[in-house]
Amino acid sequence: MILYYEGTDISDDVDVKKCVYTDVSGGRRDLIDIEFEYSNKWFGWKPEKDDTIRIVHDGLDTGILYANTVLPEQGRYRIIATGAKSAARRAATASYEDKTLGAIMRTCAGECGMDQGLYGISAGTAYPYMIRENETCTAFLDRLLIMEGGRLKCMNGKLRGIGIEYAQGQAATQCIELEATQLQARYQRRDDMKWSGITVMSPFAKASAYDSSVDGDNQPVVTTLPALDGAQAGRWARGLLLNHNRQAEELNMSMEFNAGLTAFARIDIESDTDANGEWVVDETEHDLILLKSTARLFRCITTIR
């Protein structure tokens, strides 16, 4: 394991006792929780909030994360670092008039002192008017991205808006064989939580989206969004339905360390069970001391209309 602190390799200066890396999607921040024995060089590093930490290990590269908490605990130091700087936790209220999604992303990223990027979502998507309601930058951006059919990921110094369909459309990074008797896997399907459709309605516009794989009439109506025309209402309805229904089929797995399990990665599952098929990783946890990996995946869905 190679541990970089502020860009310097300090692997030989510390004795790491615990190192867990959590790689997530859905507006949450990647996280490293690391403990090492007391080092007499520690004070010489002059640790400060938002110092950068990066770990590379056997094919896994966490990218840059930012020190959030530094705690001395029983002769050890514990560091918690996250994928976004501390400024990203500051809540604020703001309004945006005649702005594109790309412009809003740049403004919020600048507020956090980070970079930004959009993948599978148009930066030119226009918002005649949008309000940020006492939200952190990351919470606000994730709310917008959910409506646009994506999610926010804070990774390697960058606020990334990633489209769900974009992630689903990528080539599988690996194929995992799963047997019915495998104790380290749990498959869950909850058809009762799916919506057959959703309607976005405002004083100015109304539009609906539907999931062709769902029977019944479970169709909520959302009246709290500032849709100003039918195209915007329809786009938001589709994004909300996609993000909700994809959570109905979930697969949780534990295995030996697998560096290829990363959030938003496309995975093929080969199995004689109902879990067979195409999935997208939602969250992974890698224990770099015990060399174990766990992952939660959501089924790819292509039935939203």
Model-derived features with residue positions:
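Acidic, small/polar-enriched beta strand-loop surface segments
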Residues: 2, 154-156, 163-246, 250-293, ...
